């Protein structure tokens, strides 16, 4: 079965392809089908993910999977949250992973409470009008490191220090990261839901 990923993010595509491989789904990006990105006007991950999944399904006629994910920093009241991808732009930088990390470290320079969570919300729909979307959430709590460490992953992986490993996500082998990441946890829950309700 073909499923459209409501994203053009290559990092997300690679992770989700690997995680959904056991079901035999062919995951293709919306960009491959010429589908524009959906607006994300909401304040919660689940609302944005649902809007993106419905948008991709409406434009493709195929089932769709969307991920809305972000970093929620305790010292910032849970922000940047759904605005994570654009975090750097608030501080005069261009949008991008490296700039997001740079801006975060600058804003947290004198902050002692470094607790943060990476959150991934996956939503899958069979069609644009699917009355029963599948919703899976994964969450990992860690601490923001004082400097980037590691060369794997993307996003905030180089500064997301995971206490049980004593390393950032970017230092962990890909298999270990995927098994323990917010997206990995959400994908495992989504796999179970898809097996139960779609297969």
UniProtKB/Swiss-Prot annotation:
This is dITP/XTP pyrophosphatase. It catalyses: XTP + H2O = XMP + diphosphate + H(+); dITP + H2O = dIMP + diphosphate + H(+); ITP + H2O = IMP + diphosphate + H(+). Mg(2+) binds at residue 68. InterPro entries: dITP/XTP_pyrophosphatase, ITPase-like_fam, RdgB/HAM1. Belongs to the HAM1 NTPase family. It is an enzyme of class 3 (hydrolase). The active site is at residue 68. PANTHER family: INOSINE TRIPHOSPHATE PYROPHOSPHATASE (PTHR11067:SF9), INOSINE TRIPHOSPHATE PYROPHOSPHATASE/HAM1 PROTEIN (PTHR11067). One of its GO terms (cellular component) is cytosol. Homodimer. Binds 1 Mg(2+) ion per subunit. Its EC number is 3.6.1.66. It comes from the Bacteria. Substrate binds at residues 7-12, 69, 154-157, 177, 182-183.
């Amino acid at each position: 079965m073909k499923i459209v990923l409501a994203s053009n993010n290559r990092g997300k595509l690679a992770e989700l392809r690997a995680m959904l491989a056991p079901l035999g789904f062919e995951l293709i990006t919306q960009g491959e089908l010429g589908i524009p990105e959906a607006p994300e006007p909401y304040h919660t991950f689940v609302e944005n993910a649902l809007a993106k999944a419905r948008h991709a399904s409406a434009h493709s006629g195929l089932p769709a999977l969307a991920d809305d994910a972000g970093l929620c920093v305790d010292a910032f009241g849970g922000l940047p949250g759904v605005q994570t991808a654009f975090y750097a732009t608030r501080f005069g930088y261009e949008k991008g992973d490296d700039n997001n990390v740079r801006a975060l470290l600058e804003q947290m320079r004198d902050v002692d409470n470094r607790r943060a969570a990476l959150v991934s919300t996956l939503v899958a729909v069979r069609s644009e009008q699917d009355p029963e979307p599948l919703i899976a959430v994964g969450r990992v709590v860690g601490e923001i490191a004082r400097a980037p460490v590691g060369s794997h992953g993307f996003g905030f992986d180089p500064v997301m220090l995971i206490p049980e490993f004593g390393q950032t996500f970017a230092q962990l082998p890909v298999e270990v990261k995927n098994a323990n990441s917010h997206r990995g946890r959400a994908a495992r829950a989504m796999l179970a839901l898809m097996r139960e309700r779609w297969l």
